[in-house]
Amino acid sequence: SKPIPCEKSPQEQLAIMEAYTQAHRDSAALDKAERELRCLRTIFPALFRSIEDDDLLAGRLDFLPIGFGSVTSIGGVSHYCVFHKLRSFKEQLDSEEEKARVDALYAYWEEHDTKAIYCADVLNESTIGRFIDCSYPLMATARLSGMMLNYKKLMAYGLEGLKTLIRSQKPNTFLNSCVESLTLLQEVIDRQIELVREAKLDAARSRLQDLELMERDLAVIRTQKPATFHQALQLFWIYALVA
């Protein structure tokens, strides 16, 4: 993949990271599934980028130094702060007031970054080191990240079908949050439809066919299970981006 600059201004990025941090702070007493959902609402669909001229599927996403993720290679694991990226981001700001706001974020996440908490709990001087450090027999962060998504079930049921399946079980906080997370994904799809319509305004006639297909299929997968290969690709892609 080729790194590209964030589409949003440094001020917009700072505001999003502050909103995420505030949601994380305010939801400390909640169940972890509810807390995750509240935090996700501050970054989705806000972090999605505009449709580009050669896109055949909707869904481009910016990653900030603070957020939520499932892999260390892009963003971070769970509630994360990539500290060296946050320090680099600070250099993009001009005012001392904005830099002080970044310092406040840095201080908060030193105590709350998932990887930092994990390492503080398990690292020791003799046997357990960080990934990758061959000085130790055991590497603490090996496979800390990653998960397997059930794409077959996603294709078989679609988003509304998954909601129905979840609601058929005895309700609890986790399952309720799962339903709300799927609703958030539908809001992400609504935003993608808006972005496609924006792209259509200046599109050449030869490009309109691609964008119209994209818009139609987004409308389908918002509530229905996919019926075509393109719809299946679009659903799995947008689902994976926010998973």
Question: Can you describe what each PLM-predicted range is?
Answer:
Residues 156-243:
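Structured, charged N-terminal subsegments at the starts of enzyme catalytic cores
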